Amino acid sequence: MFKIVNRYGKSVTVVMRMEEKTLFTSEVLANIVCKFLNTKKTKPDWLVNNFDVVACKPYMVEKV
């Protein structure tokens, strides 16, 4: 299992298939989401967390 964390160690929660997800079974999917968040300038609609996307960069994938 993998999770995405911001620079402060907080987990990122996203909405996928109408479900909120914090843990990913695939490292590839977690890396894709992480790369997207690192290049994004504004908060995407599918991001559940209420923190500043730009100020919390870089996002990293951690193994749980």
Model-based region annotation:
Residues 1-20, 48-53, 61:
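Short aromatic-glycine-(Arg/Gly/Cys) micro-motifs in beta-strand/loop hairpins
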Residues 11-36:
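Short, flexible N-terminal segments of the mature chain
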Residues 31-64:
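Short, mixed-charge low-complexity intrinsically disordered segments
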